[in-house]
């Protein structure tokens, strides 16, 4: 399995996890000039969750979330602002998550 396939499977696993928690999937791989939003869901209380998904093997040297540095966070914020404006949800409460997916452990953290 190549990196793109691994990433897509991780994103699908994260989306399924959120849906099992009662969230509604709003977008998957939403592309903007500023970057891509991996998974966007809405919690039952209306909160929009922007989720950056990082998929790694369990023998990775560092935690997957460590890859979401300040520059990546800035791009995510800009992409999220664009998404919220495009969908008319600029006033909704928003939360940013990082999902760590470990396919060989079959887990989402």
For the regions a language model picked out, list residue spans one by one.
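Acidic-basic catalytic patches of nuclease active cores, encompassing PD-(D/E)XK
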Residues: 1-28
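Short, solvent-exposed loop/turn elements at beta->coil junctions and helix N-caps
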Residues: 27-31, 99-102
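Hydrophobic "anchor" residues on beta-strands that sit immediately upstream
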Residues: 24, 48-50, 93
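Short beta-strand or tight-loop elements
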Residues: 22, 33-37, 94
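Conserved small/polar residues in nucleotide/adenosyl-binding loops
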Residues: 108-109
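Catalytic cores of nucleic-acid endonucleases
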Residues: 55-104
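Acidic surface patches and DE-rich sequence motifs
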Residues: 32, 43, 104
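Conserved catalytic cores of phosphodiester-cleaving nucleases, focusing on short active-site segments
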Residues: 18, 37-60, 68, 76
């Amino acid at each position: 399995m190549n990196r793109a396939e691994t990433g897509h499977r991780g994103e699908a696993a994260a989306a399924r996890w959120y849906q099992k928690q009662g969230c509604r999937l709003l977008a998957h791989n939403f592309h903007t000039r500023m970057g891509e939003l991996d998974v966007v869901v809405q919690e039952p209380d209306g909160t929009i969750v922007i989720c950056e998904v990082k998929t790694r093997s369990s023998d990775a040297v560092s935690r997957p979330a460590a890859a979401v540095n300040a520059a990546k966070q800035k791009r995510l914020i800009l992409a999220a602002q664009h998404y919220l404006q495009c969908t008319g949800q600029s006033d909704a409460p928003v939360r940013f998550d990082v999902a760590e997916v470990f396919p060989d452990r079959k887990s989402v953290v």
